[in-house]
């Protein structure tokens, strides 16, 4: 599902932002 991949991408971006 593309939706699932999109959610994962958002999660990764959010985590990176929080870490940064």
UniProtKB/Swiss-Prot annotation:
Main location: membrane
Top-level taxonomic group: Eukaryota
Annotated localization: Microsome membrane; Endoplasmic reticulum membrane
Record keywords: Endoplasmic reticulum, Membrane, Microsome
One GO cellular component term noted in the UniProt record for this chain: endoplasmic reticulum membrane
UniProt entry tagged with the keyword Membrane: yes
Further facts: On the 2D-gel its MW is: 18 kDa.
Primary role: May have spermidine-binding activity.
Assembly mode: Dimer of 18 kDa and 60 kDa subunit.
Protein name per the record: Putative 18 kDa spermidine-binding protein
Species of provenance: Zea mays
């Amino acid at each position: 599902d593309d939706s699932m991949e999109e959610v994962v991408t958002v999660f990764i971006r959010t985590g990176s932002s929080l870490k940064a």
